[in-house]
């Protein structure tokens, strides 16, 4: 966050009243969304309403001890983030203050009114130019490359709001982010650092239809409810159903180039877990530490409410910057409900007319404004990049009919409904296969056919049909018991049980099972389908269900998930199933 210096202060006003994070000031010459510094301590705030001589400000810090009569200083600039090398492997708060830098200055408990630039202004980076003198460049073009971390090459771009022109001077070597590395004949100078307002989407040429899946390594997601690179997904669920673990799994194993993890109003311990785990884990694609492709934005539940509102925008702006370089970015927002609650609190302080359940009337507009910044895009420099947004939703009491869940459902195309009953039964990830859906299936099917197996969509549909049939039979089973069913339906229930227990269940804390590649996901499902086909043949030949499920090879289906050398194991298992079941008749 760029710090306002004395020369940047354009006007001063006076505080008239303070109500929690909302402060009103008089005699302040300001525009909407200007950043202001409030009170003697210079607390950062943002103008959210102007009425006559009264300016309303939401303050991004605790406002206790702020009194009427204290000054308010206007910077005349909108809330912006610093974009440049150094953002990977870093942790920020909701307004892009680097928490690790501030901790070194003042320990674990931060004082109010402190600030630090989002990017280290003194560190030097190796700049390798990609343009020469005399080259024509336009907004969005790559002018140089900086090795930012072991796994990420940071591309220095012509800022989107520049005119562009002919390169008149270009430097090579080590520079700080504020030193000029390229000069243009238009008089414009390009540094490695640029600023961008968080509420304004960065421009692109066009939005494209996503056709590649974001492979997560979670069988239930990749197999049944896939999300595309550039897609949007919501993970609603009651407390303790596994939202955060699912988000962590996606942040760890999703095949995105960059991960931006926004902890928005959730527990601090969960962010601590991310900070401790990620540096030790390897990226399956590069073998480098996961942290080297991750940017964390921590705005935990005990941090000021107003900053929750900005942290989501800070995260998506950083994601857009890396998308402009041609990277596939995954953004996790945990949890959008806390963001909506922050909006509700600010709205009620402003005495606005409440909408449903006290949320502001513009809740749907704000949610869609955020999710619509996701997508697969053609960038201004001709490259393609994507942002996939996965938002957790925490409906009180697990009630999916509340406004945040319902408005999110209208916007996203992928719905992963977490179920408290499944979580209580220790079925994880506890994604309810009857309530969840993905609208990306059809547009991703060609990719699965080409890259995994041409019959993948058909095998998946078979699994869905079996699970649907099980759901219909469960009502009868609860009334009369399983033994009263015809034998073919009893066998269907057994097959469905293996789909649930051997395929859908996955252990996030097992070294092998935590990540399941698409090929293994398919092979495991075909093994269960093979058991289904052979078992029904045995049943048709007059073999009782009890004998079929007592065959030694059948329980081996539950061990497929933990096999590293899975191809050999599954091939052998299919052979054993065939031999042992055919011996029965």
UniProtKB/Swiss-Prot annotation:
It is an enzyme of class 7 (translocase). It is a peripheral membrane protein. InterPro entries: ATP-synt_VA_C, ATP-synth_a_Xtn, ATP_synth_asu-like_sf, ATP_synth_asu_arc, ATPase_a/bsu_AS, ATPase_F1/V1/A1_a/bsu_N, ATPase_F1/V1/A1_a/bsu_N_sf, ATPase_F1/V1/A1_a/bsu_nucl-bd. It catalyses: ATP + H2O + 4 H(+)(in) = ADP + phosphate + 5 H(+)(out). The keyword ATP-binding applies. It is found in: Cell membrane. ATP binds at residues 237-244. GO terms for cellular component: plasma membrane; proton-transporting two-sector ATPase complex, catalytic domain. GO terms for biological process: proton motive force-driven plasma membrane ATP synthesis. CDD domains: ATP-synt_V_A-type_alpha_C, V_A-ATPase_A. Keywords: ATP synthesis, ATP-binding, Cell membrane, Hydrogen ion transport, Ion transport, Membrane, Nucleotide-binding, Translocase, Transport. Its EC number is 7.1.2.2. Pfam families: ATP-synt_ab, ATP-synt_ab_N, ATP-synt_ab_Xtn, ATP-synt_VA_C. One of its GO terms (molecular function) is proton-transporting ATP synthase activity, rotational mechanism. PROSITE patterns: ATPASE_ALPHA_BETA. Component of the A-type ATP synthase that produces ATP from ADP in the presence of a proton gradient across the membrane. The A chain is the catalytic subunit. PANTHER family: H(+)-TRANSPORTING TWO-SECTOR ATPASE, V-TYPE PROTON ATPASE CATALYTIC SUBUNIT A. Has multiple subunits with at least A(3), B(3), C, D, E, F, H, I and proteolipid K(x). Belongs to the ATPase alpha/beta chains family. This is A-type ATP synthase subunit A. The lineage of its organism: Archaea, Methanobacteriati, Methanobacteriota, Stenosarchaea group, Halobacteria.
């Amino acid at each position: 966050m760029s710090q306002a210096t004395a020369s940047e202060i354009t006007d001063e006003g006076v505080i008239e009243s303070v109500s929690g994070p909302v402060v009103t000031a008089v005699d302040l010459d300001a525009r909407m969304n200007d950043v202001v510094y409030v009170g003697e301590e210079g607390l950062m705030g943002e103008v959210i309403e102007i009425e006559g001589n009264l300016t309303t400000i939401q303050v991004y810090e605790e406002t206790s001890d702020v009194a009427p009569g204290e000054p308010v200083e206007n910077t005349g600039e909108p809330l912006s983030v610093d974009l440049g090398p150094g953002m990977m492997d870093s942790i920020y708060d909701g307004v892009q203050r680097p928490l690790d830098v501030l901790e070194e200055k003042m320990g674990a408990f931060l004082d109010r009114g402190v600030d630090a630039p989002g990017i280290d202004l003194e560190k030097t980076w190796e700049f390798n130019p990609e343009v020469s003198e005399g080259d024509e460049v336009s907004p969005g073009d790559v002018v140089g490359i900086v090795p930012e971390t072991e796994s990420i090459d940071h591309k220095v771009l012509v800022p989107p709001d520049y005119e562009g022109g002919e390169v008149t001077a270009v430097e090579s070597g080590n520079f700080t982010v504020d030193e000029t590395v390229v000069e243009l004949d238009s008089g414009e100078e390009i540094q490695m650092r640029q600023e961008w307002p968080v509420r304004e989407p960065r421009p692109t040429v066009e939005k494209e239809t996503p056709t590649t899946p974001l492979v997560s390594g979670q069988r239930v997601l990749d197999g049944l409810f896939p999300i595309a690179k550039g897609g949007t997904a919501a993970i609603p669920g009651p407390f303790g159903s596994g939202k955060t673990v699912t988000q962590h799994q996606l942040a760890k194993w999703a095949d995105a180039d960059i991960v931006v993890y926004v902890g928005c109003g959730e527990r601090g311990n969960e962010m601590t877990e991310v900070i401790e785990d990620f540096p030790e884990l390897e990226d399956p694609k590069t073998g480098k530490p996961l942290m080297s492709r991750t940017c964390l934005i921590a705005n935990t539940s005990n941090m000021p409410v107003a900053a929750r509102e900005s942290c989501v925008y800070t995260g998506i702006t950083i994601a857009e910057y890396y998308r402009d370089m041609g990277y596939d970015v995954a953004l996790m927002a945990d949890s959008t409900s806390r963001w909506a609650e922050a909006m509700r609190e600010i709205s009620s302080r402003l005495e606005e007319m409440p909408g449903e359940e006290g949320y502001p009337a513009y809740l749907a507009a704000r949610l869609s404004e955020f999710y619509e910044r996701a997508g697969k895009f053609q960038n201004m420099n001709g490259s393609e990049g994507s942002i996939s947004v996965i938002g957790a939703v925490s409906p009180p009491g697990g009630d999916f009919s509340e406004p945040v869940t319902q408005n999110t459902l209208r916007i996203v195309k992928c719905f992963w409904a977490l179920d408290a009953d499944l979580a209580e039964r220790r079925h994880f990830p506890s994604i309810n296969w009857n309530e969840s859906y993905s609208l990306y299936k059809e547009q991703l099917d060609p990719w699965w056919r080409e890259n995994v197996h041409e019959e993948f969509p058909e095998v998946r549909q078979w699994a869905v049909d079996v699970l649907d049939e099980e759901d219909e039979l469960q009502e009868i089973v609860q009334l009369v018991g399983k033994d009263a069913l015809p034998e073919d339906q009893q066998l269907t229930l057994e097959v469905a049980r293996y789909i649930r227990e051997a395929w859908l269940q996955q252990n996030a804390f097992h070294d092998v099972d935590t990540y399941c590649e698409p090929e293994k996901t398919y092979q495991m499902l075909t093994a269960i389908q093979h058991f289904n086909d052979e078992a029904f043949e045995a049943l048709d030949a007059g073999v009782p269900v009890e004998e079929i499920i007592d065959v030694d090879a059948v329980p081996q289906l539950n061990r497929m998930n933990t096999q590293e050398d899975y191809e050999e194991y599954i091939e052998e298992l299919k052979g054993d199933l065939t031999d042992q079941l055919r011996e029965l008749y």
